[in-house]
Each structure stands twice: as C-alpha cells, then as structure tokens.
Amino acid sequence: MGKIILTGDRPTGKLHLGHYIGSLQRRVQLQNAGDFDRMFVFMADVQALTDNADNPEKIRQNITEVALDYLSAGLDPQKCTLYIQSMIPELAELTTYLMNLISVSRVQRNPTVKTEIKMRNFEANIPLGFFCYPVSQAADITAFKATTVPAGEDQEPMLEVTRELVRRFNQTYAPVLVEPEILLPEIACCRRLPGTDGKEKMSKSLGNCIYMSDDEKTVWKKVKKMSNGEPRMSMEEPGHLEGNAVFTYLEAFSTPEYFAEFWPEFKTLDELKEQYVKGGIGDGTCKKFLNSVINKMLDPIRARRHEFEQDIPEVFNILKKGSEDAREFAAQTMDEVRKAMRIDYFSDAAYIEEQAAKFKI
C-alpha cells in the first residue's frame, strides 16, 4: 500500500479563510505535487449530524456550499477523490468494531473532545454520537488506510486516538490497519487562524469569519472591523503586534509579490513590522493592504466558483462518482478487517468445510 492522504470538513457552513490557510490550500498543493498515490477528501456529514441532529436541512444545504468551495479552491476530481461520508456505510461498521477497543474514560480524556463539549454546552447532556466521534473519525481514516492527515494542531489528540486504535486492532487481530501521521501547516500562524476579532478561532457561530466566497465589498467590510490589538491614540505612536489580527493575517497571506504590487515601499512583511512598531504607519493603511492581499488571493477562487455554480448537477455527479470510488476502497479494507476478526463467515471456505465436518454424521 502506498502513501495516502485523507482529510475532510464538516458541512455546517461555507468554508472560510481559516479552512483555506489551515488545510485546503495545502491539500491543493499536495494534490498537484503528485507525491501521494491516492488522495481522499470528504464531507463529514455524519459527524456534522452529531450536534445538528434536529436540523439535517442545514447539513443538506451546506453539502453544495462545501463542494463548491472544494472545487473553487482547486481540488481536482481527476487527481483526488471527493466524497460524502454518509455514502460509505462501511464506515459505520468499522466504527462499531473500533468502539470495542477503547474505553469511555479514554475518550473523556481527549482535550479536543473536552473543548468541543464545553463549546456546545453539552456538559450536562452529551449526545452519544457526538461523544463517540473520535472513534468515528478513526474509522474515517483507517478505512482508507491513510498514511497522512493534513490538519490543524488542535486535531493532534484525535490522531493519537486513531493511532492507539490501530495498534490495538493490529495487536488483537492482524496487522491490517495503518497508523497515520498528521501534517501540520508549514506556517505556525496558519495552524489556528484567529477570527477577525483576534480573540478566537475563526468560527461561523462567533461571527468572525471571512468566507472564501465573500465578494470584495464584504471582505473590505470585515477587514475594516478587524482588531488591531492594543489601541493607539495616533499613528505616530508605536504599533503593537501582539493580539493584532491584521498582522496575523498578513503573516498568513502576504508575499513579497503582494508588497511589490500593493505597497512597494516595503519588500517584505518583516520590513513593515519593523516600521510599524516604531510608529508612523496607520492601522487603516495596513488594513487596506490586507484587503488588497485577500481579494487578490480570492479573485481566481471566486471566478472558479462562479463557473461551477452554473452546473450544479455536474457538481453532484462528481460527488456521486467520488463516493462510489471511495466505497469500493473502503469495502476492500472491510473485507480484510472481517477476515482478521474471523467474522468473514460466508467467504471463508475452509471455515465452512470445518463446520460441515464437525456436524457430519
């Protein structure tokens, strides 16, 4: 088995710049580099339903939005497999088997689960499906024998659960499943891009997102409201980088080429920072530059999205074909899993003969 990438997103809303810089941009780069044998990218609708069970229409509508975001960002169905999680029933079966290999207390210790439970106010009444989603996520990964999972650093505890389950399964039954490694964003600030308020992770529920599909006017409206950290009385005062969302975003998105085009007074972000902390550069000017950078980056993405929006049936054809291909792969893994667990009753001819001989008079 070769090198395989697997990654995905919950279809609970349009994808934003945090998704793009945190993993989506890297996925496109990895796809185009061709260093991996297979690449799977999926919409985790089953996982999304664990905390949206009473609102399936929300998930249904956002399948289309996320698919458009994937395709507009540059994911190519000729190079990677795009699929919908619920269309692969083998994942539910594997989840059940993996649940037998982990304790409730181990899941409870997962810091990501603790954070998610608190964020959703589930402390007093946790849906079982939500509580068990680390195991479901492990099934998502292992069913496709993924060797690499591009993700943010907040997902490392989840990957560790997967690795533990792989080791436990392979030791208990047979060496069938593969231990995955996480692939973090190369730029540290991209691993957890803050919201426009500078205080929290970018999140739709917090209203601090810039979406990949936002038009130019909407982007500028949001950039103008971004946090600059500690306030200044005038631009002549020294600027502060700590807690300054504008510079965090510039760290993530600016390049020397953008400086040459939009702010030739500076060649690099380091030069701008050096002058900013001395004073003499207004926050409004920095925001205008950031606005130009973001919109320049989003222009081709928005253009591709518009093209795909004109043929939504084809978008669903892509997802249907990808789901069929993904299911075929997962089914092969499950054949190996059942054989390892000795529950391949109908395909094990030797077992049937043995049982026949046992009861033969």
Regions found by a protein language model. Give the residues of each.
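Extreme N-terminus of proteins, especially the signal/transit-peptide cleavage junction
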Residues: M1-K3, F346-S347
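N-terminal Rossmann-like or analogous alpha/beta NTP/dinucleotide-binding catalytic cores
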Residues: G2-A139, E257, K296-L298, R302, ...
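A broad detector of the eukaryotic-type serine/threonine protein kinase catalytic domain
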Residues: R10, Q47-A48, F144-V149, G207, ...
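Short coil/turn segments at secondary-structure junctions
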Residues: P11, T50, D54, V149, ...
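Structured ligand/cofactor/substrate-binding pocket environments in proteins
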Residues: L15-L24, M39-F40, D45, D54-I59, ...
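A short secondary-structure junction signal
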Residues: R109-N110, A146, A174, S205
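Conserved nucleotide- and phosphate/pyrophosphate-binding catalytic cores
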Residues: R163-I361
